[in-house]
Structure formats: C-alpha cells, structure tokens
Amino acid sequence: HEVIVVNDGSDDKTLATLIAGFNMVKAKRQQIAALQTTEIFGTYKSQTHPNLWVIDKGNGRKADAANAGIGFARTPLVCVIDADSIIETDGLLRAAEPFMLDDGKMVAVGGAIRIANGCEIRGGSLRKVRLSKNWLPRFQVVEYLRAFLTARVANAHSNTLLLISGAFGVFRRSTLVEMGGYRHDTVGEDLELIVRMHRHMRDKKEAYKIDFVPEIVCWTEAPAEWGGLKNQRARWQQGALETLIEHWRMIGNPRYGRIGLFAMPQVVIEDILGPPAELLGYLVVPVAILLGLL
C-alpha cells in the first residue's frame, strides 16, 4: 500500500513539518490520471518510509485535493480520508474485503464514523474511548450512532446507499477516474459523488454494488461550538440541495431502480422538506395548545 498526503496550498508549516518529520526529498512521480486540480508544485518521497508521498499543490479545497491524490495513486483501490480522522487498526483490511469477495462488482465501501471528542488519542492512535464533557458532541454521538448503525445498514441492505462519508471511504480507482473524480462546484462533494456513481453505473448498464460495513470504524472530531455546528449543517443542507438540483432527472425515475424510486425521493422528503416542516411544527404546536386545539 501507499500513503499519499496532499498539502492543499497550506500557508502554515505543514509541508516543512512533513519534510522534516519524515525525511522527505523532492522526487518525480508520474500522474496516472489527469483529473481536474489546481497546479501541482511538486512531489516528495520519504527516505525512511518509501511508501509515503506528499503532493504539494495550490489551494483548491477538499474535492480538488482528493482528485490530486487519486490522480497520483497507482493501486486499484484508493482510500480517501480527512487529515483529522483516525482509522482503527483493522479498518483498511475490513474495507478491502468486500472488493475481494464481490467479483469486481464492488465500486465503493464506507464505514461507521464515530465522535473522537473526549477520547484519549496518542501518537495518531485512539487509546481510550471517552465521552466529551461538552454536551454538544454528546448529542452528536447519539445522532451518529443512529445514522451509521441503523439508517446506513438498512440502505446498504436494500442497495439504496446514497452517501459514503467524506471523512472515510474506499473506492475502486478505475471507476473514480471514469467519472472524472470529485466535482468542484458543490460543497457536498461526498453525497454528489455517490449519487453520480449510481447514475454512472446504471447509465452504463453494469452490475455494481456500493456497500457499508459497520465494523469499519473511523474516528473524527465533531463541532464543539454552536457556530461550527451551524456552519457544518448549513453546508450539508446546501450540498444536498445542489446534488438534487444537479441530478433531478433521477428523482422518481424508474430507469434508476430503487435509487430513483425510493432513495432520491427520501432525500427530498427528509433533507429538503423535513427541516422547514419541523420548524413549522415548533411554531404551530404551541399556538395550537394556546388556542385549545390540542
């Protein structure tokens, strides 16, 4: 395996720290797939860890950085992971297993995302699981458990999985390259990628599978302040809207099977109509109680 770290135009000492910490030298590396990215300034190889590379490039945000890594990757499978996420020790092996057992049909695998706030982390490894003392991450622990241990499992079982978290996902590289990688014109690149992957494979009329394995656990930091949580949820909502607008022809379309008839309408109801309906409920119920209607 290889580890490719993408320095996405950072203006701090990230690149210098990587070069010094891992004894890296500038080395030429051929880009296998020319996906859309900002300018590549250089590639570096570790002299102490020959399978560790760093790509230095101009700032282009998450999707652009992921495309750079995919373009330089040489392995048939690629794992896209956020810099602040930690995979449990057997995570990659568990993620690779479905690809080996599915006769080439598997194109993407996701895992459970857990909240790392409050946990003991040393040397890049999670040593002890603890709850955060802050109530905001605690509420998100319950939310994430519901999402990843019930909803995603059910979606995967019915072949209607529309989202593999941007924090951690394993993909067949050839499929990503065929699709042109991640798109730059959406803030919900993880959702858009999987929806487009369904569309791409069904338009090609090829048998495929996108799976979720709950035993794969990736730990990540959740927003601990209301401002950060608000920005995160606004970004998720915007990403869902952008994806639905881009792929609106899939909604209710029998050509896309369960994805078009069930999964896409579910996103419309839950993510688009749900929030305003819930807000309306908060306003209507107290008024109805005051008027004696409830």
Regions found by a protein language model. Give the residues of each.
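A short, conserved alpha-helix in the catalytic core of glycosyltransferases
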Residues: 175-178, 186-212
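A conserved acidic beta->alpha catalytic loop
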Residues: 7-27
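Short beta-strand/loop segment that forms part of the nucleotide-sugar
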Residues: 1-9, 35, 55
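Short aromatic/hydrophobic "clamp" motif used to bind/position activated sugar donors
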Residues: 78
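Basic/Trp-rich segment in TM-proximal cytosolic loops or flexible interdomain/linker regions
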Residues: 153-160, 223-294
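Acidic metal-phosphate-binding loop of nucleotide-sugar-dependent transferases
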Residues: 11, 85-86, 113
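Active-site donor/metal-binding and catalytic loop motifs
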Residues: 208-227
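Long helical/loop segments within the catalytic core of UDP-sugar-dependent glycosyltransferases
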Residues: 27-67, 89-186, 201, 234-237, ...
